[in-house]
Amino acid sequence: LPLRTVMPSVTPVCFGTLYTGAQPAVHGIRKYEKPVITIDTLFDALLRAEKKPVIVAETDCSMSKIFLERNMDYYIFDTVAEVNAKAAELIMADTYDFIAVYNGNYDATMHKNGPEAPASLAALKANAEAFAMFYELIKSHWRQHNTLIGFATDHGCHEIDGNLGSHGLDMAEDLNIVHLYGAYPKEY
């Protein structure tokens, strides 16, 4: 699904919009900062519907900060490997209705090496492989549910001087993004 993210195209602003449906002026994050969002979010809607959401993310990333202070579970780890292992464990346990998993390894690597550097592409490939693993686990462990699975980036990126990567500008490379979704009906 081709989409266009919001400006400025930096992670906390973009995640604010992604999980609230509101523009930055409404959800309150207009620059790279990580306050707790206090307006209604997808997580709040799930909680009102008596669903059980969880966030699994890396320490100090936007996902581990801006959606805190809700009556839900948060699993915060220092490494992507720990994040992915916990996400796999939670999928297999089948105790949550919504699992938000955030891996910041491509973004971090892209900033240091450039968007298409071998190390950056390896991080991107690792994220695709993790998503494929989650997909297979969901297919085998969530058969009794109607399930929507998504791979949703928050912003794009571009190369800057010195072969580094960046984002945050009003340009196609930073704003044009693609989300991938799949739906799996409950098996009766």
Identify what each model region corresponds to:
Residues 1-188:
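Feature captures the catalytic ectodomains and active-site-proximal regions of enzymes
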